[in-house]
């Protein structure tokens, strides 16, 4: 379940007992439910493409960071990824969270990091 749209939190079935609310999982009211037929890597990749397209370009970290993230996800999609790429995604997340001007940049890595943490086999 994707809570609060692409920039929110992606939950696996094991987490369905968590509370929706500011004390645990804050939400803007949007929920997307995926069944087993959906490839969670492709879901995250689609969200990354969306963030890259929607970046206004005002700040360099977001403009370049979302493009680099899109490139890394496309590289993984083509089967050319390596463990180094996962480390790069972590570095991009730190950069985007600390240096981006707005929320889009701050949360652009969320779908990737959440799906890596909860649906790792989708990346292999």
Per-segment meaning from a language model:
Residues 1-124:
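Redox cofactor-anchoring modules in respiratory/redox and cofactor-processing assemblies
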